């Protein structure tokens, strides 16, 4: 349950919690406001919400339609968030647009004692075989924004639903049937890396 997930997250006493696909009023979650539940579980945290989907009714999948959907990204911070901005990712303009979310990311700022800021990017990227141009455009846009913050002397943290296979190597062709593409790490700015890459093979599994 959402309450169970919120309580589990709180039990780790985290500094930050990033949760995607948080429904405000959606058929799939029986119109329960999941954001309200999470805020109750993480009551002592500052919070930011970035809406990335608002559909009156989605007729997909056809055998069991999503129906009404209103959802987004939720960030919870132990430290005060002084400013936050929602940025829209480029998405497909073809017919598939009607079956995908309005992908976005939020940029939230947390002041640090040395006068700089910790800038937290929370994202939800496109999935289900979108075009290479869309994937590349989303990664390029995100990378440029992160690089600007790095060059300004700020600390940058990025998390969320990448909708990529973060474990797979970019030249790994072992699983061609998977919808999740390996993340093109070479497109990241020089000073950025995935935390998962610091883990051993056993820890990744």
Locate each region found by the language model.
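Proline-aspartate-enriched helix->loop->beta-strand connector
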Residues: 9, 13-23
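Active-site environment of divalent metal-dependent phosphoester hydrolases
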Residues: 24-27, 55-58, 127-130, 163-169
